[in-house]
Amino acid sequence: MAQINIEITYAFPEHYYLKKFTLDEGTTVQSAILQSGILQQFTDIDLRENKIGIFSRPVKLTDSLNDGDRIEIYRPLLADPKEIRRKRAAQQAKDQEEKKKAEKSANKEN
């Protein structure tokens, strides 16, 4: 059976794990993850919860791999992106209002 070269990666805020290895052609994403040993190294990975992708595109655990694929195991989001944007916009509005008040106050003194 032909062999394919793949990579598996798991990223953290400050660093990332990357492993390159060779598997049989037709190997599934799940089988590659299991064979890589990453689940033993990082016990926080749960294949029922963590999203999986190949080159930033979501895939199913049952999908077959191609030569050169990079399996990416995504960590769960710690914060809701919509909520973060909402808070940032509110803070910017508050900062703008304070700036306007400071400018008015400075103009009155002159």
From Swiss-Prot:
Entries under Gene3D superfamilies matching the protein: RnfH-like
Bias-annotated ranges (Basic and acidic residues): 94-110
Region (Disordered): 86-110
Annotated PANTHER family: UPF0125 PROTEIN RATB
Family classification: Belongs to the UPF0125 (RnfH) family.
HAMAP family assigned: UPF0125_RnfH
Name assigned to this protein: Protein RnfH
Organism name: Mannheimia succiniciproducens (strain KCTC 0769BP / MBEL55E)
